């Protein structure tokens, strides 16, 4: 007898099955009866593999007043995510073996959902030590560092025969600094978008592509925000994957007039003529929330002083399911971009698919649920969103991590999140 049977699971348009779970793993998928000590009837719902957010900032350690691993992971569970990958820019950053290991211990102590970690990059001397902990990637910010420094990371990974991808924030530092200097006397929110123009992103993408091709090493480009940047990436899919965020997908630079600094983010929201739309999703690998919470008083500062970032974990699935209800995307696209591809790109071999032998991670959704997005219902410490009041159709009703429900009907329950080491096989480009 198994631990758990999930019954009447609609896992595809025309396929309903029962799923047996034992010791946190999927052990049987059948249309027949499954004996289990606990049964959950999911008739009327749609069951996806547990969703994976490959781009979150939980601010822990050092900036816990913004978010920490407990509140961030609760927000993830509330939003329908069973696994997250946290970025390294904490205080201190996770850019050496000691701090990387410390962050693992923090997550294991606090997290409700499973998690992996992106490593920061400080110097080539730290790379080998971090590799022992099997990071999801090494993250670099091109707006903060030079091309020669990043080239050193590529060389070190190649010398160590380590197929760990380099994840990149693409904005050219020189273009940004020049533009900001020219616009520093303006105080209107729209000036920020002009200070980090599409050219900064596109030049940086081209530089990173050159490094990836030269070293024959995998690269993942975060939060693409312009069509031209996407066009640059497309011919080089052997080594390069890419991501879009919900705010770049659903908002444009006109949102500055309504929301001001609440929508300040890097890269900034783009004009309608250059932004990425849902119709482009078949050309992009994953959707990452870039969940980047801050204190509300920080976000109310002036355009040059307010920190960039938008909290998205608890809204993205509702927003995407609303697009599904309008025929602008499909459930199979959600499954690909928020489960299958993040697991493949970042080496989460036991995640991302509903199949025997995989972790028993599931996101259960009600396609008929309707409502309005309310930030006062968030589990995140960041109780604000530019999507406040948006009407939605479809939402998560249960999040299951290794056979354990960590969210039911909007209530987050106790969890036992684990660190998931990444197992990279070097097959990084588009599947």
Swiss-Prot record:
Substrate binds at residues 57-59, 89, 294, 308-309. GO terms for cellular component: cytoplasm. Binds 2 Zn(2+) ions per subunit. Belongs to the metallo-dependent hydrolases superfamily. DHOase family. Class I DHOase subfamily. NCBIfam families: pyrC_multi. Catalyzes the reversible cyclization of carbamoyl aspartate to dihydroorotate. This is Dihydroorotase. It comes from Methanothermobacter thermautotrophicus (strain ATCC 29096 / DSM 1053 / JCM 10044 / NBRC 100330 / Delta H) (Methanobacterium thermoautotrophicum).
